[in-house]
């Protein structure tokens, strides 16, 4: 049998603050899932005093789309606009979002459960050696900033509550 043991590195939760939402663009427009994630993050942010920030990656027109998010209660939008980001390429987008995460150290990163999000999220959680809960149906947050992530399990017969307590950022 092959054994693999990995111990979590010590970290300080106080170093990791706020929410970061990946903003997906589709045909030059912000994907509707982004607004759903902003709403959920706003609810949780109010409980722990966090900001709701976004990161958007794309080609021409990305900065203009970023400005559309501000009326929805987003505190900051980090924009990665470059002709090289025309069309989704998972590794290039993961590099940009990972740069934003490393620079800002969000406690939680929310990514929509779209085809693009399902490609991007595992790449990012692997880079940061932390957990990812896919297909969440409910999100909440504890006073200690651990997210409670609820998702269907065993063919939808039960709802599993999942928490990432020993690493940051938390991906959902």
Listing of model-derived features with the role each one plays in the protein:
Residues 1-172:
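N-terminal glycine-rich FAD/FM-binding segment characteristic of electron-transfer flavoproteins
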């Amino acid at each position: 049998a092959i054994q693999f043991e990995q111990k979590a590195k010590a970290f300080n939760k106080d170093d990791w603050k706020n929410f970061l939402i990946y903003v997906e663009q589709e045909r030059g427009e912000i994907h509707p899932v982004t607004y759903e994630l902003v709403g959920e993050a706003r609810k949780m942010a109010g409980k722990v005093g966090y900001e709701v920030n976004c990161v958007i990656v794309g080609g021409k027109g990305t900065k203009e789309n970023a400005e559309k998010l501000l009326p929805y209660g987003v505190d900051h939008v980090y924009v990665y606009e470059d002709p090289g980001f025309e069309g989704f390429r998972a590794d290039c987008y993961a590099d940009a979002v990972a740069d934003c995460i490393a620079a800002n150290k969000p406690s939680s990163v929310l990514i929509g459960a779209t085809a693009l999000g399902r490609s991007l999220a595992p790449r990012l959680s692997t880079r940061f050696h932390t957990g990812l809960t896919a297909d969440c149906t409910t999100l909440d947050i504890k006073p200690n900033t651990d997210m409670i992530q609820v998702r269907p399990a065993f063919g939808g017969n039960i709802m599993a509550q999942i928490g990432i307590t020993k690493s940051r950022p938390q991906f959902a």
